[in-house]
Every structure is written in structure tokens, then in C-alpha cells.
Amino acid sequence: MTRQVALDKVRNIGIMAHIDAGKTTTTERILYYTGRLHRMGEVHDGGATMDWMEQEKERGITITSAATTCFWSPKYGNYKGENHRINIIDTPGHVDFTVEVERSLRVLDGAVALFCAVGGVEPQSETVWRQANKYGVPRIAYINKMDRTGADFFDTIKAIRERLNSNPVPLQIPIGEGEIYAGFVDLIRMKGIIFDKEDGSTYEEVEIPHDLENEARTWRINMLEAVSEVDETLLEKYLNGEDITESEVRKVLRQATLNVDIIPVLCGSSFKNKGVQFMLDAVVDYLASPLDDGEVEGHHPRTEEDVVRHPSDDEPFAALAFKIATDPFVGKLTFFRVYSGMLKAGSYVLNSITGKKERVGRVLQMHSNKREDLDAVYAGDIAAAVGLKEVRTGDTLCDEASPVVLEKMVFPEPVIQIAIEPKTKVDSDKLGVSLAKLAEEDPTFRVKTDDETGQTLIAGMGELHLEILVDRLRREFKVEANVGQPQVAYRETIRSKVDFEGKFVRQSGGKGQFGLVNITVEPLEEGKGYEFVDAVKGGVIPREYIPAVNAGIQEAMKDGVVAGYPMQDIKVTLFDGKYHDVDSSEMAFKIAGSIGFKGGARKANPVLLEPIMKVEVVTPEEYLGDVMGDLSGRRGHIEGMGQRAGAQFVGAKVPLSAMFGYSTDLRSMTQGRANYSMEFESYREVPKNIAETLQEKRSSKDAQ
């Protein structure tokens, strides 16, 4: 059994963009040109192949990262005529589904960043760009919708440079914009490409139009200067006025793209079939193969020693599970990226996070929601496994004889929660199982039971996120449920450092209970969560009781001292204590830890925190005053404003608690002509009057 395509001919790419930049349409065109589709689906008629969930077809947005495989042989460039395998992950553009983008980027070798030629760089573009920077993902930019009225290629380039702090280098410039968009000038070959008006998939190569000759020369010089800066040999040739070959330019462009020194920029109109073929050539030419990415580092699950895996079929098997999905026909699907080795269908793998062995029943190559069986997968492949029951997102799958734990994925905490109740007894029986399956698929979706009311609470990244999950309950799991009003996920923290003694003594005949701890409680910087330091010396507390102290503290943190909300960003140092030979126990020290923490937290200037959202509103100018006044009335802090795509935009930081129902209010305020995006920014201290209201609510709840 050998691989079909050499590793250097594989490209694992993501398509990332703001909502409505034309992402799903572009993927459809890629599949059409690479021979995977016979009829192209349009997003606006609900027929797109990659948008396969019912809600996606209805809303015209992509929610889950559908994965698909296709093949492409470039017509131009250094890989001309060589067949390449392209694995594509289509990622959602709505900020509530940022987790899908995050986990896709973790396993990709490159990305195509889509921008709308009219809208330019929009808020989600910035979010996704930051995520791609975090993982060092090489990318090319494709400026789509060049045929739309108001399209501005060069303005979008400027926005990429300024708003994304990147180095965009156009490899093409458009011939016409808006309704007169006809094609582009290829700055590497210095030729014009004119697309057929009726069928954009056919085109002819022409000389550069006279009125564009000077502009094309200027932008070619700009491109040559940019690539020369990253290669000394090329720089020398350029400064000496020597000829630089097309092959040399592409070779250096590739290296500079892989190093994320430059972002090659292309243009087109996917809807009109113009430009996608050349974007595919660029994917092959400039984006990384698994070999370019090189080795991945991890550690041994038992010894914690560093372990390295190279992208080779001969190395031991190592893969990362990056997505769990429920398929109506085959059950649980585990999407994984193979970093080294090979895996045959029917063989066993070790989950190095849980230490459990599981059998991979089938290995599938996915085409959106269709599938084909594979006998084996190899280094660099992206596939889906059937039969893995206990694997979760971010787990490492590996060879039992050579275990490794790859770097885990980190997901943001949910910021909004709602109570959910089944409508009937039948629904009640199914609700728990169905919610557990959804939580397994989505690491930012949490389910818990309120200890006091017994209500089931679901938490997620935004109103749309939870709305779609409740919708999936109804459609996929046939569970009808009522949902309550959204609740904000408040948090608590401390502002001061204090020492405190926690003591638990119980003497009631027979064996007593005794545990005494001395701890320091102090604030940590935002986002650090919780840190426990064992600074006990001289055996004043036996070693076996110290984990119990830590457990008691963590349990106490779940129920804060201000209004009962979870506490975060706190460091606790255990520095002293006492024990009793007979009466001490793990339970006694757990309770002592809890008492000590609660007492210390009350003295350490505790405060209530609320999630603050980064909000951007794009509105016609006549409504600007109303929009700004409304945001200020919601305790919003206006941070910036300006013009974008013929409209005004306002940036603000607003508490989440003030944003519920905002879409309806904005619609009525602007007659439906404005839109907005919102994403979590950080936690901030709640104003005193609101904190008091929340404390009163808590007190009245406790009194009931």
C-alpha cells in the first residue's frame, strides 16, 4: 500500500474570510474547476455543496468546517502540469463560530484569505488574521467580487497593509473594476488575461492594454523590490539591472510567502467564474506542503521528554483530532490531520491524552458531507475516522509503541448562557444525550446543571451560536425545548494580596477531623486563570494532603464571594500549615483549603467582572448620530470611526449585558440598512451600581 500523491505535491489549505466575502462560492468554483462538481451550487439559492447543514442552507452562512479533497495541475509556474492534491477546509466567517476557524488553522499548512473588493478588511478579517498569525500560517490574499459596483482593488490592498499590519504584494492588477471588470494583468509574466463575458471559465491571453502599461510597470517594480528584499542574490541582480527570470521570481516569492514575509495578492470574481483557476495555480506555487512545514514537536506522555515527528510515512503514526462531528449514517466522525506515519483502516490507535486504545473501524475521505472509504492514510493527509468513541477535539492519536502528545488546542470560555427546558417527557429523556453530543462536537459549547434550581444551562460564544445549537436539537435530534432569556457569564476576581489561615476541626466522639492551612491569595494578570504554588517546607503538611488543598480551593472558586460567580485570574500559594497524626485526612485538608480561600478572597478586595464585546457597526451616514448615541446609552465606549465602502463605521467596546436584542434595535433604528459584528474582547470590572444589583439578586436567591 503506497501513497497516491508525493508529499511535496500535497497542499492542506483553509479558506478564511469575513462573512459574505464569497467564501463558500469560491470553494464551489474550486471544486468545479478541479472536476469534483458537475453543477455548481449557489449560496443564494441554498444549493452550495460545502454548506451542508440545514441551517447553513437557510441562512446562507457556513457554520462547520466542511473538509474536501480535490486535484489540480497548474497551467503556469514552476509546477506547470504537475498534479497536486489539495485538501480544503471551508471555515465559517461569523465570529460566533471562531472556534471552527481556530481549530482549522491549527492543522493547515496554508490559507487563502478572501476579501470583498467593496467591503475591504472587515472586523472578522482582522480576527481570522490574528488567529493565522498565532499559528504562523502562510497565506495568499484573493480580492473577490471585483465585478461589484464600488469594487476598489488598491483600496483593499491599502487596508490589508494598514489594518492587518501586513506586507501585501500584488501579483496581478485588475483590468477595469465594477461592471467593466474584464480580467487582470499578470505582473510576473507581464501579460493580460481577458475573461469571456458570458463564461468566465474561458479566457484569452493578450498584450497589456496601453492605458495600463505604466501602472503595470510600476506595480511590477514594486513586486520585484518586495521579493528582492528577502533574497540577497535576487537583490544583487535587481540592483545591477540584470534580467530576473519568471522561475526565479516564483521561487523567491514562494519562500517569502512561507516565511510570512509577504502576502501575494490576486483578484477575481468567483461568482462570475473569473480568476479562481489562477488562484489555484498560486495555491500550488506559493503555499506550503507538509514537507515545508517540517517536524512537529510534542512530548512523551509519561516521561514528559521532548519528542519530534517528521512528515514521513516511515515514522511512527501521530495525528491530531481537530474536529468531532455526528453523521446521521455512520455516527461519530473524528476529523484528524496526520503529521507522521501511516494508518490502515481497521487498526488500533492510542489516544495519548486518555491513555486508551481504540480501533479505527473505517477511514473516510470527506467531500463536504459525502464520503469515500480509504484503505489507509499517510503523513500530511486530512481524513475522518469512524469508530473512535472517546476521542475529543485536540486529542493526539498515535502508535502505542511510540507515544507522543502533540500541542493541545486552547479554546475561549463561553460568554453567554441560557436555561433550556424540554417541552415533554419524551424530550426530557433525549435532551441530556443530545446536548452531550453537541458539546462533544463543539469545545466552546458547555452544558451544566444549576445546583440550586436544577435547571439545565447551556453556554456558548454568542446569541447566534446558541440559537443554531437549539435549532440543531430540534432538527437533528428531534428534541423540542423552551429556552430562557440569555444570561451573561459574569466572573469574579481579586485586586489585593492577603495571607489567610483556613482551619477545619471537628470533634464529636470517635475519630475527629483536623486540617490547617496558611495560604497567600493574590491576583494574576488577566487571562491566566488559576495558579497553585506548593511552598510548604519541612513536612508541616504531608505530601499526600497537598492535592486535596488544591482541589478544595478550585471547588471554592466555582462559587465566588461577591455574587456567587466563578472566580478567575488568581494565584494561591500554600506556605504553611499543621496536621494531626490521627485526625487529619484528605477531606479535612480539602475543606480547610476551601475555608482558607473563601476567607482570603473576601479580604483581598474582590470585584465582579463582566464580558466586554468589541462591536463594529457599518451604517449609512444619516443614522450615524443615532447609532453612536445608542451605543453610548448601552455603556459603550466609542473607540473609532471612519468611512468604509461608501458608509460610516463605528467601533466601540460595549458590555455584553447591554447588547441583547441589539440586532432588532439596530434594524428599526436604521430601517434595516446597517449591520454590525460583535466579538468577545475581555473581562472588565462591573460599575458599582450594577454590581450592587447583581449582589441583591444573589442575596434574594439565597434567601428563598
From Swiss-Prot:
Top-level lineage group: Bacteria
One Gene Ontology molecular-function label: GTPase activity
Entry-linked Pfam families: EFG_C, EFG_III, EFG_IV, GTP_EFTU, GTP_EFTU_D2
Subcellular location: Cytoplasm
Domain tr-type G, chain residue ranges per copy: 8-291
GO BP term, pick one: ribosome disassembly
Any one GO CC term of the record: cytoplasm
Record SUPFAM superfamilies: EF-G C-terminal domain-like, P-loop containing nucleoside triphosphate hydrolases, Ribosomal protein S5 domain 2-like, Translation proteins
Gene3D superfamilies tied to this protein: 3.30.230.10, 3.30.70.240, Elongation Factor G (Translational Gtpase), domain 3 (3.30.70.870), P-loop containing nucleotide triphosphate hydrolases (3.40.50.300), Translation factors (2.40.30.10)
Family annotation (InterPro entries): EFG_II (IPR041095), EFG_III (IPR009022), EFG_III/V (IPR035647), EFG_IV (IPR047872), EFG_V (IPR035649), EFG_V-like (IPR000640), EFTu-like_2 (IPR004161), G_TR_CS (IPR031157)
Residues holding GTP: 17-24, 90-94, 144-147
Keywords tagged on the record: Cytoplasm, Elongation factor, GTP-binding, Nucleotide-binding, Protein biosynthesis
Alphabetized PROSITE patterns for the sequence: G_TR_1, G_TR_2
Family as reported in the entry's similarity comment: Belongs to the TRAFAC class translation factor GTPase superfamily. Classic translation factor GTPase family. EF-G/EF-2 subfamily.
Functional description taken from the UniProt entry: Catalyzes the GTP-dependent ribosomal translocation step during translation elongation. During this step, the ribosome changes from the pre-translocational (PRE) to the post-translocational (POST) state as the newly formed A-site-bound peptidyl-tRNA and P-site-bound deacylated tRNA move to the P and E sites, respectively. Catalyzes the coordinated movement of the two tRNA molecules, the mRNA and conformational changes in the ribosome.
NCBIfam families attached to this UniProt entry: EF-G, PRK12740.1-5, small_GTP
Protein name: Elongation factor G
Gene this protein is translated from: fusA
